[in-house]
Amino acid sequence: DANMSDDIFADLMLPEPHFHLGVGGGTHAEQVGKVMMAYEDICLNIERPDLLIVVGDVNSTAACAQVAAKLHIKVAHIEAGLRSGDRLMPEEINRLVTDAICDYLWTPSPDADENLKNEGHPDSRIIRVGNIMMDSYELLSAKIDDEHAPAKYGLENEDYGVVTLHRPSNVDDPEILKTIMDGLVENSQKIKLIFAVHPRTRKSLEQYNL
């Protein structure tokens, strides 16, 4: 979603990217294939990096890592070693594939280190760098405070929770989404919730009349 992407760059005070792959929605295979072709073109014809750093567990993470590995470009993975144990999740497959071909496994936590060791990754490739989500929060905490978001919702003197949903496995199936929404409604009786609705989630909520 272009609008959401622009908002994220602005909120995090990030510069415009030098390259935009221009890959939108589609099936997992379509996304991975299009990303691989677009990124390979950059590496071969525009700018070949000395090191590719990929983040997280999305399709572009695994796709770009595969391109780099096949072009003999070193790859580092931020958030390496995170596991859900559920191979029905597309993100879990992306994690496993990416970590299997990376040269540097940059982990957020001790459990991630152990997951990688249990999978046979050598200690020399595992480097704990910490949780980048917490880094982001620390860098932006003053900006967050300046937004006075609790006051906007009348919550400055109350406990509250913030909710967002975006994983396809949670929002694309009407039964699963209804179960989650019922749980949120129930919990909202105990604590007020602010629901930051992702475009994909909004579409499903409207489609399923939830």
Give names to the regions the model predicted.
Residues 87-91, 139-140, 207-208:
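Short secondary-structure transition/capping segments
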Residues 59, 82, 133, 168-169, ...:
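Short, glycine/serine-rich, charged loops/turns that create anion-binding
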Residues 8, 20-122:
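Active-site and donor-binding regions of nucleotide-sugar-utilizing enzymes
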